[in-house]
């Protein structure tokens, strides 16, 4: 990455995307594209990739999305979060560092709670909000913009 900028790239299912921003305003950007997983895949991996709290939160969702779509969105969002924060955190961390806490369908946002302190700005209990959208009926895209001003992190 060139000095003074941050960015992210992604590709899947015939789609590709890139995002860049100036470092003074943005600490990191993360984007991810994923194909919505099939039901048999979801059934075989769900309990190994989400926490019991996340599973309970998924159970409370009102049915706007299939469980496969929701799980794909969660995985994609965690990937976007990792891409945006890894350069500042400076170490590898697992997807369990943040925990899904809700979805706002109208605003197309996903909320996550930080459950492992990653940096002074990303401490235990901090809430992050990521955006999502559909590129087609079976392909999702998520993004996380980590801004210097924490009130702008949407």
What spans do the regions from the language model cover?
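Conserved nucleotide-ligand handling architecture
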Residues: 1-154
């Amino acid at each position: 990455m060139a000095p003074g900028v941050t960015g992210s790239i992604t590709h899947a299912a015939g789609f590709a995307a890139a995002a860049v921003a100036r470092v003074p305003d943005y600490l990191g950007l993360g984007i991810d594209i994923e194909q919505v997983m099939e039901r048999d895949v979801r059934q075989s991996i769900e309990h190994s990739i989400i926490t019991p709290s996340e599973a309970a939160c998924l159970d409370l969702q009102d049915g706007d999305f299939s469980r496969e779509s929701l799980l794909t969105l969660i995985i994609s969002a965690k990937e976007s979060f990792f891409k945006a924060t890894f350069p500042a955190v400076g170490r590898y961390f697992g997807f369990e560092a943040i925990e899904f806490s809700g979805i706002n369908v109208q605003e197309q946002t996903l909320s996550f709670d930080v459950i492992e302190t990653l940096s002074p700005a990303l401490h235990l209990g901090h809430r992050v909000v990521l955006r999502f959208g559909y590129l087609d009926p079976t392909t999702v895209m998520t993004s996380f913009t980590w801004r210097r001003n924490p009130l702008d992190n949407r």
